[in-house]
């Protein structure tokens, strides 16, 4: 059987003394609540275990990282959403075979070095899925299955779209940062392109301000708080998305958009890894629609 890119990296690590290999396991528990006109419409609770591995070349600045999804459990209300989520979990395991090139200036993901492997795994999964649903007779059901496959394929085969999806996942926002390359930021504000969780494909400028809460020789506890410009709150693209997707059921017209991101991180600065973290994201069309995400991660053995 052909070895994967990451298996080959493992073998090279064993043969070279200028390469540093590290790994941690994390447990991530996340709750997403969507409310329409103040009434809960959908709640998704996800429990996941991940293996986070990274390799650094000690002679020249270069790093690869790999975050494998070990197991995942999802509960959803209303239950009618459960079946589509089960297929999405299968696809998550494929996506999480990605190996990332790390930007040595920021600690952020710069690209997927084994993207071709992910596409190959997707093609195999798609073939099996089409075989499993070949019995379908209903034209509407067939159309829904094909639409689902097309929407997934659009993301997986496009490295930039897949990267954007990873940046929308809380665990990636928390694990991939300056500390990973020995350049943590506890003072200066940073500007990011925040990926909306409420409106797919929408990004807008967000300013993050750090503040140290507690520190020792080896560890730091710090928080990040966000601010969004008034321009982003009234963006035409968000208004258009709201009018098309939500206004028909909510009826109330678009008011204004707001988003908040807050996180608390316990960082082992000496060994350069997150020990535990908690973050909140809230997005809303004021008075009409809201999405709240609460995510906690912690290192496990």
Question: Across the structure, where does each feature detected by a protein language model lie?
Answer:
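Signature of exported/secreted
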Residues: 2-301
């Amino acid at each position: 059987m052909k070895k994967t890119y990451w298996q080959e990296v493992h073998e090279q690590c064993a043969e070279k003394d200028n390469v540093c290999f590290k790994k941690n396991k994390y447990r991530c528990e996340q709750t997403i609540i969507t409310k329409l006109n103040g009434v809960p419409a959908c709640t998704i609770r996800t429990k996941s275990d991940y293996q986070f591995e990274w390799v650094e070349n000690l002679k020249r600045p270069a790093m690869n990282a790999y975050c494998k999804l070990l197991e995942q459990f999802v509960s959803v209300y209303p239950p009618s959403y459960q079946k589509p989520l089960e297929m999405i979990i299968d696809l998550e395991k494929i996506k999480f075979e990605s190996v990332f090139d790390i930007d040595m200036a920021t600690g952020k993901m710069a690209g997927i070095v084994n993207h071709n492997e992910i596409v190959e795994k997707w093609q195999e999964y798609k073939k099996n899925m089409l075989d499993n649903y070949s019995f379908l007779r209903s034209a509407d059901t067939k159309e829904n299955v094909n639409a689902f496959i097309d929407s997934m394929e659009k993301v997986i085969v496009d490295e930039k779209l897949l990267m954007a999806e990873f940046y929308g996942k809380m665990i990636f926002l928390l694990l991939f940062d300056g500390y990973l390359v020995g350049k943590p930021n506890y003072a200066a504000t940073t500007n990011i392109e925040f990926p909306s969780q409420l409106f797919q494909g929408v990004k807008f400028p967000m300013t993050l301000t750090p503040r140290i809460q507690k520190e020792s020789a080896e560890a730091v506890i710090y928080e990040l708080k966000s601010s969004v410009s008034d321009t982003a709150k009234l963006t035409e693209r968000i208004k258009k998305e709201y009018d098309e997707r939500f206004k028909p059921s909510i009826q109330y017209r678009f008011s204004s958009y707001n988003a908040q991101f807050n996180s608390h991180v316990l960082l082992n600065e000496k060994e350069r890894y997150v020990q535990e973290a908690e973050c909140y994201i809230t997005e809303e069309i004021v008075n009409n629609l809201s999405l709240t995400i609460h995510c906690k991660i912690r290192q496990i053995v």
